[in-house]
Amino acid sequence: GRTPRADFHHGQVGTMNSGRLHFILRNNSIMKNLILLSDRNNYMFQTTHILAIALLSILTVMSSRADEPAPFPIWKSGAMLAEAEKLPEISNVDFHVIKKWDKKSDGYTFLHGVGLAQHKGKLYASFGHNKGAENTVSEEAQYRVSEDGGRTWGALKVIDAGDEPDLAVSHGVFHVHEGALWAFHGAYYGKMKRVHTRAYRLDEKTSTWEKHGIVAEDGFWPMNQPVRMADGNWIMPGFAAGPYSSKGVFPAAIAISHGDNFGKWDLVKIPVAKGLKNMWGESAIFVDGKTIFNISRYGTAAVALVAKSEDSGRNWSPSSASNLPMTTSKPAAGILSTGQRYLVCTTAKGNGGKRTPLTIALSEPNENRFSKIFVIRRSRHDGRPGESADKLSLSYPYAMEYDGNLYVGYSNNGGRNGNLNSAELAVIPIKSLIVLE
């Protein structure tokens, strides 16, 4: 009753009961299946574990991105954004020099913040001027007057040199209203402490400036001229300044008049989007009825920050990064008589923080998104008025429309370090800025 069996250890053949053999073979098959099933389950576990980790990572990234606001669409979707070298230039611009940097002759080092106004047939240009360092107590608000559209300029004159101990008055903005010329200038004590805005009105008979005192406090420094809103008040863009810090957040701000009373302005500081750091929020605006767009300077990245108000500047969305690159410098903005919105600064693809070339971004008529950029001037400017160099800064623009032209004042450091600037002027025919749909 015995059958041969295999002795696997010694290679010998013996006998084994057939039922026992069947039992062993069956159990051996079960073990193999169990091992295969275990391996399969282990593989599935490892795969599931890897997929779970990957999914968790994706969800974490999506969650973090969800916390970041989408770029504000101030640049029109689908419009081509070119590099600086490929941007078209405006060919028929007239250039003039308002004040040449000439320390050897006049002792002035710092110059910045051109302001412009046309008043009773004359062109006024103001700026902050200092024989010492920038943002020190020796700074003065000065101006010059041209009677031929900016080709030649009269003597340097003073709006306010600061008549209190430790008081400095610097650059500001003009405002023409009901036949009178007003000026609003940033001022401070010491080195950028207690920053505020002071108002002045030109006395036509004496050619001196009447002082109307402090009209806005809590750091407000105006950067561009007031614009009338739909509610009858005027809105003036600027920022809330203080002693500079590379890590500080100095937000964009606006001041709102009490009707035509320019002796009192309500300050509104614009909130800042979460995560924004190193902001020096010098700002500009354009006004579309009750809707106001504020475009301001960033510090961490070369991108325009944009905020929006739907109630004539009383409440704002936070200043947040837009989809338009812009150098880290003060912009100028507004609406042309054509209905086009404009932004003067340096806006070009991949240009970083370079303050050249000086550009103007334009929208199509009655649109609130820019879609075209022109170069006003580049660094090399040989044979034409103004300083020329391979590398220089063309910054801090101020713009106003008058008699078919857009007048743009700006600083030019001529390749010198810091704001050792000349004040220059570009006069652009409005017909050169028309963007066809």
Give the residues covered by each predicted segment.
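Beta-rich carbohydrate-recognition and catalytic domains
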Residues: 67-109, 117-167, 176-328, 335-390, ...
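Bacterial N-terminal signal peptides
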Residues: 51-60
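Sec/Tat signal peptide C-region and signal peptidase I cleavage site
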Residues: 62-65
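Short hydrophobic alpha-helical segments enriched in small aliphatic residues
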Residues: 10-11
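Short linear motifs in low-complexity or flexible loops
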Residues: 2-4, 15
